[in-house]
């Protein structure tokens, strides 16, 4: 692990919202007087009725309940748009940068207001009411922001599904939350390639019930099928409605959105976030972590299909009256300079991306970066997975020219916002460390038995205190919420991540400790990939583990046992990769498939994943005790035929 320390640049300590002394003072208050601290933070948003009850939380077994600001009344869209209009009507709210470098648009707060009202009125005329669910399956185009904010405006609950997910995954998510309306596009554009979104929706709706309307945005003009009794063109419907739409009065704990995330079981979990606590926390973390000041141009490269896009493209920045950049494309199209050209074109000050992108661009060498200016950049950020020190150093030295601090942020879909992070004016940096907890966050490291580990140590990361941005439940399944997050270590939120704390009290996230793989910063449940493989007629059994991958952080390694009489071939290997892409989406494509006559199982039939992980990591010498296996000889075959063998 790198132990090089980067001091806070003097000018940052001077201009930042928070320096080291202020961090210590604010953190101490957030722990000693949480009610007073969060009551003060709640003033950063507009309320129709200000809250008098601040925190009402229980992590007790059988009684997990999380409520913040519960008697307050507000509207999230009002806070992201309307309240800025008197001062910022003509300020750019969203800079949209298309997949094609020649396409970009500036959308002012006034234009955003009008477009969101149009979208909200379209939904209202289709009988969408407060509490109804709307599934959004869109590319990174402005209409994705309009759709999310329109739902917030009228009190509908949005469920955004990443536009890379397959029809089956989409159908699963539509059915789980019983959406009434889908908002999609004819096609998406990504890296110059078209993505058949409307066709995917049509295929999904063959397996999903209860959808009354499909609103279709014309993105490419490609030929699609339209069902005249169900489908409507967005541009035609928008021409029929006004640009005024009153906001719904929402209670603080009314749901804002559902976002599905992979769990260690096959069924995706609908993570439910509510209105006030989420918004306060997203806005506050955006201000302090990115040291946002009026006039900054801020770019988070995530997709709105993930929580990072929800919190740090949309809700956090817009609540703060910021200018936020929304990017339709990919880092390497049309070439490896794309990110840096966009930074120069739009004079971006703050840049927040994933280690996967950094590692991929690092492989292309320094030249594509160095031929651009990047003079506007002041701050860099990293999100989605731990960043290895080598990639951190390259990001700092080459992209940031040794002058931009890096905020290496740790958080989850479930947490709503950033939990462990440097603050650029306060925290000395160590490459690869997420450093220290944000205000109100109390990390605790425990061993497998739940014993609290003090000082310099390694173990499982728990959180002992609630914070306003945390999820409230798994949609429709509170028992699963308790079981997943609060049953492993009673009275504590278990993150599922391993963690090391060093002698300076800095936190280093070491990766998942449950059956979840972090691929390119996105969580993929091993059970989900296994289920997809076993659904293939030639597959009898499958086991999936993660392995270290130079670009993605973790790759997907699948062990597949075939049906009797089926021969393993290279063609079948390719067919299975294609099959998984179709079942779940490209993000779940196995990097390695090893055909295995048998899997290592205990006598009770449990697959020993520890052994499979070591083989996938090409560490056959550290398999540990295999004597408890029903058939230890299985391991020899797996070791001999491993796909990741390093060349001698």
UniProtKB/Swiss-Prot annotation:
Q: What is its EC number?
A: 6.2.1.1
Upon changing residue 414 to Q, the result is: Great decrease in activity
Q: How is it modified after translation?
A: Acetylated. Deacetylation by the SIR2-homolog deacetylase activates the enzyme.
Q: Name one Pfam family in it.
A: AMP-binding_C
Q: Which InterPro entries match?
A: Ac_CoA_lig (IPR011904), ACAS_N (IPR032387), AMP-bd_C (IPR025110), AMP-bd_C_sf (IPR045851), AMP-binding_CS (IPR020845), AMP-dep_synth/lig_dom (IPR000873), ANL_N_sf (IPR042099)
Which SUPFAM superfamilies does this UniProt record tie to the protein? Acetyl-CoA synthetase-like
Q: Which GO terms describe its biological process?
A: acetyl-CoA biosynthetic process; acetyl-CoA biosynthetic process from acetate
Give the keywords, sorted: Acetylation, ATP-binding, Ligase, Magnesium, Metal-binding, Nucleotide-binding
State the PROSITE patterns in the record.
Answer: AMP_BINDING (PS00455)
Cellular component GO terms held in the UniProt record:
cytosol
Which cofactors go with this protein? Mg(2+)
Chain positions found as N6-acetyllysine: 606
Q: Which reaction does it catalyse?
A: acetate + ATP + CoA = acetyl-CoA + AMP + diphosphate
Q: What does this protein do?
A: Catalyzes the conversion of acetate into acetyl-CoA (AcCoA), an essential intermediate at the junction of anabolic and catabolic pathways. AcsA undergoes a two-step reaction. In the first half reaction, AcsA combines acetate with ATP to form acetyl-adenylate (AcAMP) intermediate. In the second half reaction, it can then transfer the acetyl group from AcAMP to the sulfhydryl group of CoA, forming the product AcCoA.
Name of this chain's protein: Acetyl-coenzyme A synthetase
Q: Which organism is it from?
A: Bradyrhizobium diazoefficiens (strain JCM 10833 / BCRC 13528 / IAM 13628 / NBRC 14792 / USDA 110)
Which taxonomic lineage does the organism of this UniProt entry have?
Bacteria, Pseudomonadati, Pseudomonadota, Alphaproteobacteria, Hyphomicrobiales
């Amino acid at each position: 692990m790198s132990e090089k320390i980067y001091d806070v640049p003097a000018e940052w300590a001077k201009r930042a919202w928070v320096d080291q002394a202020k961090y210590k003072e604010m953190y101490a208050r957030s722990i000693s007087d949480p009610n007073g601290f969060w009551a003060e933070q709640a003033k950063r948003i507009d309320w129709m009725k200000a809250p008098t009850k601040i925190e009402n939380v229980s992590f007790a077994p059988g009684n997990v309940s999380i409520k913040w600001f519960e008697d307050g009344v507000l509207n999230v869209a009002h806070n992201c748009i309307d309240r800025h209009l008197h001062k910022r009507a003509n300020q750019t709210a969203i800079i949209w940068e298309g997949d094609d470098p020649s396409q970009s648009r500036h959308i002012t707060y006034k234009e955003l207001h009008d477009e969101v009202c149009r979208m909200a009125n379209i939904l209202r005329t289709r009988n969408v009411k407060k509490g109804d669910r709307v599934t959004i399956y869109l590319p990174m185009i402005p209409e994705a922001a309009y759709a999310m904010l329109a739902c917030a405006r009228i009190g509908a609950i949005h469920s955004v599904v990443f536009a890379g997910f397959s029809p089956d995954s989409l159908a699963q998510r539509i059915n789980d939350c019983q959406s009434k309306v889908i908002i999609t596009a004819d096609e998406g554009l990504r890296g110059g390639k078209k993505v058949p979104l409307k066709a995917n929706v049509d295929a999904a709706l063959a397996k999903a019930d209860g959808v009354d309307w499909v609103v279709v945005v014309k993105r490419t003009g490609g030929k699609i099928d339209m069902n005249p009794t169900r489908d409507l063109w967005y541009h035609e419907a928008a021409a029929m409605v006004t640009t005024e739409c009153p906001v719904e009065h929402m209670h603080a704990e009314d749901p804002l959105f559902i976002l599905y995330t992979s769990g260690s079981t096959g069924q995706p979990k609908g993570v439910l976030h509510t209105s006030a606590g989420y918004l306060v926390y997203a806005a506050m973390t955006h201000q302090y972590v990115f040291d946002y000041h009026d006039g900054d141009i801020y770019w988070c490269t995530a997709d709105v299909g993930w929580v990072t896009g929800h919190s740090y493209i949309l809700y956090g920045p817009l609540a703060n009256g910021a200018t936020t950049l929304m990017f339709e494309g990919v880092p390497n199209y049309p070439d490896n300079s794309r990110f840096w050209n966009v930074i120069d074109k739009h004079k971006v000050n703050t840049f927040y991306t994933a280690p996967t992108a950094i590692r991929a661009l690092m492989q292309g060498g320094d030249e594509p970066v160095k031929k651009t200016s990047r003079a506007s950049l002041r701050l860099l950020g990293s999100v989605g997975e731990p960043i290895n020190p080598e990639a951190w150093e390259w990001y700092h030295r080459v992209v940031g020219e040794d002058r931009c601090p890096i905020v290496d942020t740790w958080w989850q879909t479930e947490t709503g916002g950033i939990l462990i992070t440097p603050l650029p004016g306060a925290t000395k940096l160590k490459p690869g460390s997420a450093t220290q907890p944000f205000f109100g966050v109390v990390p605790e490291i425990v061993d497998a038995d739940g014993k609290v580990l003090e000082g310099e140590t390694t173990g499982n990361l728990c959180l002992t205190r609630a914070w306003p941005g945390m999820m409230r439940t798994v949609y429709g399944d509170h028992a699963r919420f308790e079981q997943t997050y609060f049953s492993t270590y009673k009275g504590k939120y278990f993150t599922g991540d391993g963690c090391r704390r060093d002698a300076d009290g800095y936190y280093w996230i070491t990766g998942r400790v449950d059956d979840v793989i972090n691929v390119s910063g996105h969580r993929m449940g091993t059970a989900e990939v296994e289920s997809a493989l076993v659904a293939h007629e030639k597959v009898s059994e499958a086991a999936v583990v993660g392995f270290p991958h130079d670009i993605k952080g973790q790759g997907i390694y699948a062990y597949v046992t075939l049906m009797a009489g089926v021969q393993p071939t290279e063609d079948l290997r390719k067919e299975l990769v294609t099959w998984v892409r179709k079942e779940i989406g490209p993000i779940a494509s196995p990097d390695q498939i090893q055909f295995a006559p048998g899997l290592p199982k205990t006598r009770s039939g449990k697959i020993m994943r520890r052994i499979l992980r070591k083989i996938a990591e090409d560490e056959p010498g550290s398999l540990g005790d295999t004597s408890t296996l029903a058939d230890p000889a299985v391991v020899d075959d797996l070791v001999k035929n491993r796909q990741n063998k390093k060349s001698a």
